[in-house]
Design a protein with these regions (language model features):
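Juxtamembrane/transmembrane-helix boundary motifs in multi-pass membrane proteins
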Residues: 5-13, 46-49, 145-146, 235
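Gly/Gly-Pro-rich "capping" loops immediately C-terminal to redox-active cysteine motifs
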Residues: 48-53, 65-108, 149, 161-203
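Flexible coil segments in periplasmic/lumen-exposed cytochrome c-class electron-transfer proteins
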Residues: 2, 97-166, 172, 183, ...
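Electrostatic cytochrome c docking/interface patches
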Residues: 30-54, 71, 126-151, 171
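Hydrophobic secretory-pathway targeting helix
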Residues: 2-39
Length: 263
């Protein structure tokens, strides 16, 4: 007892007791805050998913089925992931304006919050590609324009043309222009393969290489005539027309000159 009393009268006893008391209170508050925050986040997530389900039932289920299992006119959405929904809905391709051969890009029908809710709901159906975060899309820091140009020419140019302006495909389909497309949507298209586009998994094209492709596309946007003279921008036939007119004109001119010389 005397030893305990002596410790209590020590000069450092009061500061030490105060320190441990504050430490205990702080630790208790941190644990309680973390628990409350986790519960709040979980509740918010549940609300978002339910909102997405209601949007799906009203705007998507007539084509994709009540359980997103798909139908004769629309594919299943099970396993497509949040990235696919964010791309299709965020670019206005879905819902489709009409049942044409290909979904065209247009102004989105749903706002950002509704799109996020719809993506969150579809993501709960089965695992699939997630929406890339801002830290994953820093193409200016992590991408290489030179590497991106080479990758684009090897993997993308045969459909989107070497300047990313788009081009015709078979059966009335087309590869859209990549000019003016958000980096997030370019990335999502590569990992989900919308419509006729193949899926470029991380094993085929790594995340860093995807950022390089995006960086090259963004650099191409700044160059108005990436392929040289625009020839009036009336379509690819202008090059062939110019070749035929100049070529035939020169041949006719040479023929006339030779005929006159023979006389």
């Amino acid at each position: 007892m005397k030893r305990i009393s002596r410790y209590r009268r020590h000069k450092a006893a009061a500061p030490l007791l105060l320190f441990f008391a504050l430490l205990t209170v702080g630790a208790t508050f941190s644990v309680a805050s973390a628990t409350t925050s986790a519960e709040t986040t979980s509740a918010d997530r549940s609300v978002q998913i339910e909102e997405g389900r209601q949007i799906f039932l009203k705007g998507c289920s007539s084509c994709h089925g009540l359980n997103a299992e798909g139908a004769q006119i629309a594919p299943s959405l099970i396993g497509v992931g949040a990235a696919s929904v964010d791309f299709q809905v965020g670019t206005g391709r879905m819902p489709m304006a009409d049942m044409s051969t290909q979904a065209m890009r247009k102004d989105p029908i749903y706002n950002a919050e509704e799109t996020a809710a719809l993506a969150a709901y579809v993501a709960t159906l089965a695992p699939g590609p997630a929406i890339p975060g801002e830290s994953e899309l820093n193409f200016e820091r992590d991408g290489s324009t030179a590497e991106g140009g080479e990758l684009f020419r090897n993997n993308c140019a045969m459909c989107h043309n070497f300047a990313g302006q788009g081009g015709a495909l078979t059966q009335g389909k087309y590869a859209p222009t990549l000019m003016g497309v958000e980096p997030k949507h370019i990335y999502e298209a590569m990992v989900t393969g919308p419509q006729s586009m193949p899926v470029f998994s991380d094993k085929t094209i790594t995340p860093e290489e995807k950022l390089s492709i995006i960086k090259w596309i963004k650099s191409a946007e700044k160059e108005p005539n990436l392929g040289g003279a625009s020839l009036g921008r009336v379509g690819p036939v202008t090059e062939g027309l110019l070749g035929w007119v100049l070529g035939l004109g020169m041949l006719i001119g040479v023929a006339v000159w030779l005929a006159m010389k023979a006389r």
